[in-house]
Amino acid sequence: MAPRIERHTGPEEDREEEIHSHQSPSVSGDDDGVEISERPPKRRRLSDSESSEDDPFVPQQPLPTLSRIKKKSDLSAAKGPDRNADQPDPVTAKDAFAMGLQSMDSSFSSLGLAPWLVGSLSAMAIRRPTAIQRACIPEILKGRDCIGGSRTGSGKTVAFAAPILHRWSEDPFGIFAVVLTPTRELALQIFEQFKAISAPQSLKPVLITGGSEMRPQAIALSTRPHVVIATPGRLADHIKTSGQDTIYGLNRVRMVVLDEADRLLASGPGSMLPDVETCLSALPPSTSRQTLLFTATVTQEVRALKSMPRPKDRLPIFVTEISTENNTTIPPTLKQCYLQVPMTHREAFLHVLLSTDANSSKPAIIFCNRTKTADLLDRLLRRLGHRVTSLHSLLPQSERTSNLARFRASAARLLVATDVAARGLDIPSVGLVVNFDVPRNPDDYIHRVGRTARAGREGEAITLVGQRDVQLVLAIEERVGRQMVAWEEEGVSIEGRIVRGGLLKDVGGAKREALGEIEEGRDVLGRRVRKLKKTR
């Protein structure tokens, strides 16, 4: 193509036309002020006589833009290849039914659960049933009463929640099921699990526990929720004091669950059995309902229920106790240790133990036998620089809930607790359990150490042993069928660190400050509060 010629006739036209930097440079002539451009510029009509057979029109390239708004294709190209391109999208609750239909050959489907329920469990990454779930779910779906025993962390909640939701979805009405559990924290956890599993459906669960106002709970009960999760004491209070309109729906309950049945049916001081009997009195008789009992430690009181007389038209009670390959009641992935300490310096030994290289980053639960000890340790460890919170029965319910939420969210690394945290709580991140006080009952030890090494994970339990605790340790070893080993860490001498580092003085000063704060009636943040009262 011939180069285009542009002539300048006026003085102002002697200026060279501005050329964009991205276009090729022009070649200028010296004779007639002629500029020869090697690239096709924007076409300009010079005269009426210009032939229509001029060079074809070539559009000018757009100017570079400063806008930060880019096309999606440009953004994808800039980011490069997607590393997760081969991975499936996250499963939402809306996809649960379709997921269940596509997974009819899965293990949960073979147990007889509805497709929507199988899909919902898959959305929660629960795809393979555990031994207790494989044993109990089919029998519960047949309508049999059930007594299920399995060690901690084996999935007992799903073992009764899944069949309850399956049968409820077939005939949803009123108060379909009641779940009784000994602690508020465990009741809250079960309540949240029911909501999560039933997300594709319109289940209405309600939580009835102490520490909260009774009026809103009574209103919630009167609206006929589908599932009631409660502690026996508070539900018994409603049965005794609330009107008949509030508890009327309880007389049509189809299914009843006693979770941690060994604790609910235990007799003696602090027994919950009277409250449990009050709750059961408001429900249909045992011949008209299905009763499910689950526990990690099957006691004689629980086993005795198997031999109770039953009508001829009722199926026999299904009883299963899931044993492991080594026939123990604690996970095989749990390492049990003991550490001998002088009774007068237990706090200093605990402080150094939690500060070693192996334990300094582990989320841990520290169990005490008394609420006053737990309160003191919370204040003392806080002064020694640990991120700590507490959980015991003297705290208001709002504080108990918030403290547990902080620990779950890793805002606090240590949780100082009494046995209210020993049962049922599922916090997978816990890697260490410390028994500051040796439990008096070996079954309590089983529940305490069961807060770690859950679902096949590894965990460690360390028990601080004084001179008077030897017989308790021997009883625990006989109960669990395994011996504890002496705790040790390479290159670490706790006694040496305490002596050389002068930690006894630091810990002693922190303890005096904590005791003074308690005497003044202040909380862990130094605020003056009223004396805490224990509520049901």
Curated annotation (Swiss-Prot):
Gene Ontology molecular functions: ATP binding; ATP hydrolysis activity; RNA binding; RNA helicase activity
Keywords annotated in UniProt: ATP-binding, Helicase, Hydrolase, Nucleotide-binding, Nucleus, Ribosome biogenesis, RNA-binding, rRNA processing
Biased composition (Basic and acidic residues): 1-21
GO CC entries: cytosol; nucleolus
Binding site for ATP: 150-157
Domain Helicase ATP-binding: 137-316
Record domain Helicase C-terminal: where: 348-498
Catalysis: reaction(s): ATP + H2O = ADP + phosphate + H(+)
Residue ranges of the motif Q motif: 106-134
Enzyme class: hydrolase
Location, primary (coarse class): nucleus
Motif (DEAD box): 259-262
Intracellular or extracellular location(s): Nucleus, Nucleolus
EC number of this enzyme: 3.6.4.13
Pfam families, A to Z: DEAD, Helicase_C
UniProt-listed InterPro entries: DEAD/DEAH_box_helicase_dom (IPR011545), DEAD_box_RNA_helicase (IPR050079), Helicase_ATP-bd (IPR014001), Helicase_C-like (IPR001650), P-loop_NTPase (IPR027417), RNA-helicase_DEAD-box_CS (IPR000629), RNA_helicase_DEAD_Q_motif (IPR014014)
GO BP terms in the entry: rRNA processing
Region (Disordered), start-end ranges: 1-91
PANTHER family referenced in this protein's UniProt entry, alphabetically: ATP-DEPENDENT RNA HELICASE, ATP-DEPENDENT RNA HELICASE RHLE-RELATED
Function, in words: ATP-binding RNA helicase involved in 40S ribosomal subunit biogenesis and is required for the normal formation of 18S rRNAs through pre-rRNA processing at A0, A1 and A2 sites. Required for vegetative growth.
Family membership noted in the UniProt record: Belongs to the DEAD box helicase family. DDX49/DBP8 subfamily.
Comment, domains: The Q motif is unique to and characteristic of the DEAD box family of RNA helicases and controls ATP binding and hydrolysis.
Protein name, UniProt field: ATP-dependent RNA helicase DBP8
